[in-house]
């Protein structure tokens, strides 16, 4: 919404109609032929769509209820989102974050039409670093910058990025705009507060008056080649003449089988076909690697034969940060490393969540209570138990046991657990949590904030039914209780559980001890220094 209102998405002046949407998906062009590679749509629930008709208006508000704009509805339709995913992302694999967002977290109805802005979107963070396209172009004019090369990033910048951007600016004799995305990025990315502090720590390493930092409120789609073209359009709207495009630009990496969603230089190839039409010049770069003998970064295709090189992938860096490990000095600058360390303490100081899942009577609550006591005995962190029955009583008393309501309940537990984890505490959650998709949503919610482990209490149904301390299975078999997991409702056993326990032959004490040992192995509990 913000970029539609401030001109960042020019020539768009509203959300796409079905004609523009279909044309963009099929041909990367609006219905009038203008190059545009990514659908910009407003998705709404069925209930909202039923109250709206073409020619009507829809108020668009922020999270606090402030009306930011009015949409004049010109088109209302139900898109084929599978077809959209295949056209835009080249896949329907939900492991692609853009596809997962589109297929699983997008409402079924799209509304297109012209926007009437009422007031700008409010931001309270880094106000001095946020510029509209008009403001940024005016700043360039005031500085006398006639050629500006933009650098798009969603990650902290390190030595390789600094060398790459310096080379790019020198190559085309342009000033440098570091233009990081601070909207939605890829799950697991470093939060934007930490990233901005890292950019600010890096900025003094550029020659004076040659580089500036501005934040872009863009939600990335991780769309690879198409997204590179989109980024070029957006940067042109912000007054830039060039765009750095590196290896796997805006790509999500690989799927769980190790297959890359896009080729390493697909984005460069697609943008090169359109840069003349766009009026933005691409500055292509290959992977930068560290050459030990020269203590410097060099494009991989320029490394002299026989020279030893070092490289740290984004995945390896995230793993080091998650475990609180030191980032090597050849990889980043000390000031950047300090900022990352502030936001990524060692694992034994991080918060974490244990999400128990299993059938009623499997032993979840008993183990969770024993574990709670053991963790409190160890000290060092605040520990909270979110037991299924207690949550139903205090947080979800109005909910039933339909799939929709079960998922809402688990998301509520996940939200509370995420806040506990973010603030360095331990959340021990013991619902039934029968459905895999919502467990994955909770994982995605918490993993960027700290540790997350699924504990599958895999006690067989016949054992749970034999115990039946509350008489629930007997009532379910008799039809007195409807929608009972394991009898009339399904239970989807997790395939991604970090810990699997069967209490058929284990006591609750023994099971809790297994979990403690796993936490010790993973570094979440440690002896006193």
Predicted segments, located by residue:
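Active-site cores that bind ATP or allylic diphosphates and position pyrophosphate for catalysis
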Residues: 1-348
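Glycine-rich phosphate-binding loop of ATP-dependent small-molecule kinases
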Residues: 17, 29, 139, 143, ...
């Amino acid at each position: 919404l913000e970029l539609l209102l401030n001109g960042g998405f020019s020539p768009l002046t509203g959300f796409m109609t079905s004609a523009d949407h279909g044309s963009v998906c099929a041909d990367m062009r609006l219905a009038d032929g203008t190059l545009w590679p990514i659908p910009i749509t407003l998705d709404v629930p069925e209930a909202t769509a039923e109250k709206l008709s073409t020619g009507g208006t829809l108020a668009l508000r922020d999270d606090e209820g402030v009306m930011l704009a009015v949409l004049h509805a010109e088109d209302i339709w139900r898109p084929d989102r599978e077809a959209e995913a295949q056209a835009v992302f080249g896949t329907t694999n939900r492991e692609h974050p853009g596809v997962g967002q589109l297929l699983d977290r997008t409402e079924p109805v799209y509304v297109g039409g012209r926007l009437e802005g009422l007031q700008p979107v409010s931001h309270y963070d880094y106000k001095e670093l946020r510029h509209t396209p008009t403001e940024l172009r005016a700043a360039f004019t005031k500085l006398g910058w006639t050629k500006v090369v933009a650098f798009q990033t969603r990650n902290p910048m390190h030595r390789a990025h600094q060398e790459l951007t310096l080379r790019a600016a020198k190559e085309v004799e342009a000033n440098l705009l570091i233009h990081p995305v601070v909207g939605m990025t890829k799950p697991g990315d470093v939060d934007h507060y930490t990233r901005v502090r890292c950019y600010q720590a890096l900025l003094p390493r550029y020659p004076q008056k040659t580089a500036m930092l501005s934040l872009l409120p863009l939600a990335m789609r991780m769309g690879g080649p198409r997204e590179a073209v989109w980024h070029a359009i957006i940067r042109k709207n912000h007054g830039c003449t060039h765009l750095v495009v590196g290896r796997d630009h805006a790509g999500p990496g690989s799927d769980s089988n190790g297959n890359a969603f896009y080729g390493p230089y697909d984005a460069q190839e697609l943008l090169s076909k359109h840069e003349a039409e766009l009026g933005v010049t691409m500055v292509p770069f290959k992977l930068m690697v560290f050459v030990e003998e020269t203590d410097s970064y060099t494009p991989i295709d320029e490394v002299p034969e026989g020279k030893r090189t070092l490289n740290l992938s984004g995945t390896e860096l995230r793993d080091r940060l998650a475990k609180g490990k030191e980032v090597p000095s050849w990889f980043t600058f000390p000031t950047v490393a300090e900022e990352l360390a502030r936001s990524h303490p060692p694992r034994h100081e991080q918060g974490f969540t244990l999400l128990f899942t299993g059938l009623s009577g499997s032993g979840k609550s008993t183990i969770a209570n024993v574990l709670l006591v053991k963790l409190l005995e160890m000290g060092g962190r605040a520990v909270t138990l979110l037991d299924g029955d207690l949550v139903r009583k205090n947080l979800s008393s109005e909910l039933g046991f339909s799939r929709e309501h079960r998922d809402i309940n688990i998301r509520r537990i996940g939200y509370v657990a995420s806040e506990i984890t973010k603030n360095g505490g331990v959340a021990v959650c013991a619902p039934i949590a029968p459905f895999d998709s919502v467990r994955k949503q909770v994982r995605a919610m918490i993993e960027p904030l700290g540790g997350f482990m699924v504990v599958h209490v895999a006690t067989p149904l016949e054992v749970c039914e034999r115990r039946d301390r509350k008489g629930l299975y007997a009532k379910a078999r008799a039809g007195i209780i409807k929608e009972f997991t394991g009898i009339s409702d399904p239970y989807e056993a997790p395939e991604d559980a970090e810990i699997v326990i069967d209490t058929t032959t284990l006591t609750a004490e023994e099971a809790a001890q297994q979990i403690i040992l796993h936490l010790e192995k993973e570094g979440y509990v440690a002896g006193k220094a």
